């Protein structure tokens, strides 16, 4: 189905991995702890944005006075993710595409999560060993919707951007793929993969 492309690039959360519930619960716990309001449509719109940038935007949006640094809040959320991941994370149906192209096409993961979190999540879902590169938000200057994440994936795989196809669930990620000059697959529209992140 994707034979025309030289490389396949995947977002992780909501695309390769069903983790929407995990991230919603850990965001709710984090925002509650630090007194930041929960705005469901706003959180949904920030899907795919790294935790640091999400927190900065929320504090700015609500004009919050928070007695903690952004780093402290990110550390709290990441710890909750590690503690609760085993309860809420599993691979999506895209694992079939990954298996079908393993050894035939180079593949990479480009995510708004930290690289360490991504590697841990992929391992937990039995997806480690399939990807030539895993690019987390900590590896790029500008996260999605900037193209940096997917451009670095392509560079690490040794493939030109125009020869890549990106699988994404979030508008920010689809924008990033377009800005990188790559074909993009909206996994909800094409593969019926739903992200249950802040639906209500």
Feature map (PLM): residue ranges:
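Active-site neighborhood of HAD-like aspartate-dependent phosphohydrolases
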Residues: 1-43, 179, 193-194
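Helix N-cap/coil-helix junction residues
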Residues: 36-38, 64, 127, 158-159
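An amphipathic alpha-helix signature
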Residues: 24, 28, 51-56, 74, ...
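Alpha-helical substrate-recognition element adjacent to the catalytic core
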Residues: 30-62
């Amino acid at each position: 189905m994707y034979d025309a492309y030289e490389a396949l690039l995947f977002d992780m959360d909501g695309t390769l991995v069903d983790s929407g519930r995990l991230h919603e619960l850990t965001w709710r716990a984090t925002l509650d702890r630090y007194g930041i309001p929960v705005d469901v449509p706003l959180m949904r719109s920030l899907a795919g944005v790294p935790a640091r940038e999400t927190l900065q935007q929320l504090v700015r949006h609500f004009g919050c006075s928070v007695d903690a640094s952004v780093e402290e809040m990110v550390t709290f959320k990441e710890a909750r993710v590690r503690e609760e991941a085993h309860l809420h994370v599993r691979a999506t149906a895209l694992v079939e595409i990954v298996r079908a192209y393993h050894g035939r096409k180079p593949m990479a993961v480009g995510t708004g999560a930290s690289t360490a979190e991504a590697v841990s999540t992929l391992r937990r879902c039995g997806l480690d060993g399939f990807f030539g590169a895993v690019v987390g938000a900590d590896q790029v200057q500008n996260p999605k919707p900037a193209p940096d994440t997917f451009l670095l994936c392509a560079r690490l795989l040794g493939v030109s951007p125009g020869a890549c196809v990106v699988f994404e669930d979030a508008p920010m990620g689809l924008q990033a793929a377009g800005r990188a000059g790559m074909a993009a697959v909206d996994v909800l529209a094409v593969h019926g993969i739903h992200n249950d992140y802040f639906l209500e």
